[in-house]
Amino acid sequence: MISTKDLSGLPNAERLKNFCKGLAALDIIMVEEEWSFIRHYTYNPAWRKGKEAFFATDGSDQSMIVLFAPEGCVINGVDSELYDWEEKLPRIEDLTDGMPPALQKLMSSREVKKMKSTFCVWTEDGTTWHCNPMDSEDASKDLLSTIDGNPLSYVEYGKWFYPADLPLEAVRQLADGVPVTKELVTALNPKRNEWEEIKAGLDKIGYPHEL
């Protein structure tokens, strides 16, 4: 399983971006707008000029932000329950040691500072991932496993969260960034037919569709 001890299962940054958008699109399709506050995944294609951001939460103690920029990609995660006192959190200087300056600027964003950090992972070339693993538990195994690029992870997530048995082929299309159609929505959530609401949600996260 992916963790800061073994990053070999993380997809490349381009695949990761599609996968993250797909997770956010899945939440839009499965959870109506009036219940959007319970969604676990959101995506902002215009987080900063030329930069995009994916936000994830388990609804409790674990949170993660993935930042995509021309200079590379940074993944920051935290489990607030791992430490009794804030001063026991890992030093950000230790977590980012060796990180290129351009990516360190992303780590200084107000969203990351507010979230705090128990781990961070980065890539400059979009393929090779780096981190400075801590000796203590850091929640990376739980959080990174949700963005492994595998459509089956979507299916397992759906069984637990919605709950629903999501069709693998429909889920695979979301993971691959295939435009959402009415047929795809119906395959995932037969009860969902608020087309304008879905369209607006997908437009907001920059996910392609044919609605």
Regions found by a protein language model. Give the residues of each.
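N-terminal domain-onset segments
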Residues: M1-D61, P70, W85-L211
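Alpha-helical solenoid scaffolds in large eukaryotic transport, assembly, and signaling factors
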Residues: C73-I75
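Short, solvent-exposed aromatic-acidic interface loops
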Residues: V78-W85
